[in-house]
UniProtKB/Swiss-Prot annotation:
Pfam families: ABC_membrane, ABC_tran, TMD0_ABC. This is ATP-binding cassette sub-family C member 2. Belongs to the ABC transporter superfamily. ABCC family. Conjugate transporter (TC 3.A.1.208) subfamily. ATP 1 binds at residues 669-676. Glycans are attached at residues 7, 12, 1009. Its EC number is 7.6.2.-, 7.6.2.2, 7.6.2.3. Keywords: ATP-binding, Cell membrane, Glycoprotein, Lipid transport, Membrane, Nucleotide-binding, Phosphoprotein, Repeat, Translocase, Transmembrane, Transmembrane helix, Transport. Expressed in liver, kidney and small intestine. Residues 909-918 have a biased composition (Low complexity). The lineage of its organism: Eukaryota, Metazoa, Chordata, Craniata, Vertebrata. One of its GO terms (cellular component) is apical plasma membrane. It comes from Oryctolagus cuniculus. The gene is ABCC2. GO terms for biological process: bile acid and bile salt transport; leukotriene transport.
Amino acid sequence: MLDKFCNSTFWNSSLLDSPEADLPLCFEQTVLVWIPLIFLWLLAPWQLFHVYRSRTKRSPITKFYLAKQVLVGCLLILAVIELILVLTENSGQATIPAVRYTNPILYLVTWLLVLLIQHSRQSCVQKNSWFLSLFWILSILCGTFQFQTLIRTLLRDSNSNLAYSCLFFISYGFQILILILSAFSEKDNSSKNPSVTASFLSKISFSWYDSVVLKGYKRPLTLEDVWDIDEEFKAKTIVSRFEVHMAKELKKARKAFQKRQQKKSQKNSRLQGLNKNQSQSQDVLVLEETKKKNKKSGTTKDFPKSWLVKTIFKTFYMVLLKSFLLKLVYDLLTFLNPQLLKLLITFVSDPNSYAWLGYIFAILLFAVALIQSICLQTYFHMCFNLGMCVGTTVMATVYKKALTISNLAKRQYTIGETVNLMSVDAQKLMDVTNFIHLVWSSVLQIVLSIYFLWVELGPSVLAGVGVMVLLIPVNGILATKNRNIQFKNMKYKDKRLRIMNEILSGMKILKYFAWEPSFKDQVHNLRKKELKNLRTFAYMQSVVMFLLYLTPVLVSVTTFSVYVLVDSNNILDAEKAFTSITLFNILRFPMSMLPNVISAMLQASVSVDRLEKYLSGDDLDTSAIQRDPNFDKAVQFSEASFTWDRNLEPTIRNVNLDIMPGQLVAVVGTVGSGKSSLMSAMLGEMENVHGHITIKGTTAYVPQQSWIQNGTIKDNILFGAEFDERRYQRVLEACALLPDLEILPGGDLAEIGEKGINLSGGQKQRISLARASYQNSDIYILDDPLSAVDAHVGKHIFNKVLGPNGLLNGKTRLLVTHSLHFLPQVDEIVVVENGTILEKGSYSSLLAKKGVFAKNLKMFVKHTDSEGEVTVNDGSEEDDDDDSGLISSIEEFPEDSISLTLKRENSLHRTLSRSSRSSGRRLKSLKNSLKAQNGKTPKEEEVVKGQKLIKKEFMETGKVKFSIYLKYLQAIGWCSIVGIIFAYVLNSVAFIGSNLWLSAWTSDSNTYNGTNYPASQRDLRIGIFGVLGLAQGLTVLVASFWSASGCAHASNILHKQLLNNILRAPMSFFNTTPIGRIVNRFAGDISTVDDTLPQSLRSWMMCFLAIISTLIMICMATPVFAVIIIPLAIIYVAVQVFYVATSRQLRRLDSVTRSPIYSHFTETVSGLPVIRAFEHQQRFLKQNEIGIDTNQKCVSSWITSNRWLAFRLELVGNLVVFSSALMMVIYRDTLSGDVVGFVLSNALNITQTLNWLVRMTSETETNIVAVERITEYIKVENEAPWVTDKRPPAGWPHKGEIQFSNYQVRYRPELDLVLKGINCDIKSMEKIGVVGRTGAGKSSLTNCLFRILEAAGGHITIDGIDIASIGLHDLRGKLTIIPQDPVLFSGSLRMNLDPFNNYSDEEIWRALELAHLKSFVAGLQHGLSREVSEAEDNLSIGQRQLLCLGRALLRKSKILVLDEATAAVDLETDHLIQTTIRNEFSHCTVITIAHRLHTIMDSDKIMVLDNGNIVEYGSPEELLESAGPFSLMAKESGIENVNNTAFWAAAARDAGAGRLSPGFASVT
């Protein structure tokens, strides 16, 4: 039929037998013309529909668009001309074939369609159509045959159809021009990422990334150089898609979980029924015990399962499908190579075959390899981006869950464990996603390999398959063991990171008590277990590697042996051998990768379980908190009962309470009565038992322990709200922050560090209050905000913020307070006891009622006046039953004596006192400066010296220094390195030997052609080939074992050095370095050194030697190939140099941008109640998304850089294959089939090996960055040695005499002095009180005594010994401190008291008795073994402070420092601590940093500090008599003489004798 259509022959059946490759003209004019046209017309409707759906605003006409349209227009004109020529041809000639009419008409219509498509693309972001590019490529390729036919026809006959030929040549040229134009992309200003607008050719070759690589080569890349990720990869887009499917799948999983629970319940019921009339069986007891343990630990083995993987699949199924198709095409094309190799060997072996066939085979080899490269790299790009998306999804979802998780579920996880979910577990899922298709792909490749091997060798291949099958269960057993080891290791890692988190959080306490060695041992012990598992895992992996490496060798040896042994006529020739070897090489990859993928999947399954358990945990149930904007009351409790744990009794019980809008309500009660729980219930932080709470309007919350974000003071106060300068200034003034801003460098733009590390407790609390005040909410929940400020500041804040005339006047305020003198000014008082409301009413009504509140209040006033210490009302309180004077009495009490839970706060004490005459002028000046600052934020270079407390994370640039590699190699050990290299070299020798031996074996087919093959020769060939194969496996096993041992040793050394150095770093390092940044070294970087780096080093060594071996073998066969290697090597090296510079820096950027994600997460978890109260979850989610997107743009860029490199390397590899094949064709007369097979079978491997080599080079350099980052912290400057040769005498200090001589100190070299020439003598057993405002130098004095700060000048001597001359532990171990913040660590109570086990149980119990904790600890279930949780939430602040007192009592050193030790405790606890100190430390030198003047009035001497100088120093009597700063402070506190302070002793006696009821400490 087609013959008639063309009037010529359609197909020539003897084409392959002709000396010239010439397709029939009819075939060229029909099939080769129609293929591209059919492709275009089939896809055009779908393309136009897609354009219609995704169209955006039409872009302006560009030169590219015009050029392409003009060229297509020219093609249209040429088609018209051709049609006219056909129609006007001489009718006298022979009949014109139909094809001459149809082709121009088809082209005419097609070019019109192309014009339409190109025009429609102008309304899309992507102007170039990928399918149009494919059409042009197909059209040009198909036209090539017609092009060469016309050329040859014209050369034979110059007048043959010249016009038609010219039209074709012009059309062909235009098509090439259009394809060239299509390779360039038209820029779109709406897109920041060029990948969005990149052309098809640019995308498949990753050429759009060239500019980044060039930039990275010229200079180190910065974050600004990296393009933003495309919208589809952003966290918000991905998570929104993920959550839709997650909701459905989680719902199904929960139903399945409930069914499992019901079945278990029924089974247990039956079990109990069987044992009803018998004593409980052992099994039931064990079951019950297990339940108890699970309940206690907060963990359950069962939870909603198997939903996460389904959700991920449903979210990303399109990417999975596309990547599946690409991998399928790649795998199928892989099996064309052995067939082409076979054809080439046949071609060389047959001297009669035509040369053009050889060239066609060589070109086909190159074409197949090129298509494979495009498919593989696009596949990898998709999969790695998918992995990145999965990682993004996990991190964002875990963060979002953390914002909604219930408190009960949250308690099951430490912060370290949750961070691990975001880092380690997310990474495991990313890794497995990258190679998920290898599961089915490996199976497909194995099956196809076996099939093609059967075709070559027949049933003999079954012997090889049998070997593979036998090894499957072995690999399965090893994989299972590896999973268990991995699971254990994750637990050890979690524990280690938890301890590290605590160490870093409580570093100052460790240094004060010289406890670093104890905690170092704890970490080392866990690390030993971790490394033991790591070694076992590495050894198991070595065995797996050995089996994987040996399997293809065993299979090939077995198969070849059986093939030649079963039939004497079976002789192994080059065709069979090298085709089979190529198939065995194909088989090697899936065989080696499948167990790795299975192992990765097993590891990922552990992570999936952990993530499913966390993400399926219960959310905070706020259904009991009803918000009604039209409600007539501000807050209403209706029969409300709430609990922290449903397994425990309710903490808040049957509360009925109405609070009207605008009221100021004080909540008072005993310690542990439920005041804070009542506030938490209102915030929805507790589990509802029954009843509900109705709230009208928005809430703001000030927690008891202030939560400060790492940022500026201004950011903390604004808390995401719009900046209103007038309100902002009012808030600063009302919260008494203006004087503090004057002290701080940079004012409100000063960075205040992680957790507000460089602020006092009072400053943090006032910033917390300012944050709430600025928000302009309807209801303010204030949990004891005045506890951290002194009396004058408290009064100022109450009057200016909380009180009737304060900033929040008109707002509803619930105030938990311990300050009696404010109670008369509140609208209502709520008295809480044991979770219930005892009384409620106004101050006067409660007094009139004469209930618990009035009774305790009168008792307080009576005992105060009975001693005659405080005279406030001229005898108006004589009648005990008369309440009329109580209001005035309470109002006129000296605040310093009534405020029962005060914390250090002297900054405003000074600035608000009468001694500050210039206060007004300074405040005005500061306001003006703040206005200037808020109007225009200073640039970074304008920031005041010392303003930026948190240093920007240091990032190396350029090549990783050789010293880093050297450090790692030294850590491995030079003996191990030599052994590893030697083993791998032997492996390469065995590899070359086995190939040469196989080549010699196949040449036997020529030697013994037609004759009997000697059995001895056959056996020799088999034996040596088998020995060489076994040698390859054994050398890999030895190298892997040696490497595993050496790398584990290196990991141990680096971790040990890092830990030792971090523990020895000065406090200034921790003050300027966020904890998350340090933890990242112990988590991510150590994990890289443990797992990834050893693997990449091993792979690099194997790839490098494999390439050298292959090139040696090719050059041995064809020496001329050495000439081609040189230019290819230059290209290879150039590409690598360009790539490595970029990749290395991108990896560094990845590390630097990852730390803030974890820091932000840790910060969020610690401030959850505040974030929820302000309803700022969405803002924090957005911040997290921005952080993730910033990190992921570095990851995405790194992924693209890998693909950019791989494509170019594979191109080099493909050129090696093409060059080798070309050489075989050119020199076929001098080569034999076995040489061709030998060369090409190895050349086919080089593409993949080259790719892996550069990837491993990059991976190694990328991963060695972890060693670089660890080394950075190993090199951190240490504080002084813990122990020196000069040690103090035994029993030192025996007196406790301290002398400061012209002592000067500064916090950091670039900062000013904080102590400026301190001179004073403290005699033995003296009691010294130290006072002064914030910034005066009080805490600095303490830090100097412990050498937390080192002297900038002068010296301190204790008992005649200069403390700078002895070791830090010799010094700190002999001093004792009770710090302001009572820090405890996870572990037992005993460990917290005595981490070194230096004391007996009797001594510890005695210390607890003196600390008034014996009965409490004895009453605990496990006594001294009772575990303290990470957040210390199972002990009150008072109990923690008493434990700190217990530490001091155990030490019983001659010098005791009280750094505002009773600042955060109530009167009872304060009294207990003060009494114990007076009794037990009477023979010691005691230095007290004062928060209340009354506590230091019985001191021998008072030291008044101001601006780093001692302004007064003398006995209290002397200082009160002089008209100095201390005298003014005392008068303001109501102290006129030393005897005035007897109030405290009286109150203490009453409380101790039981004459004061517990309410005394609570009506506060």
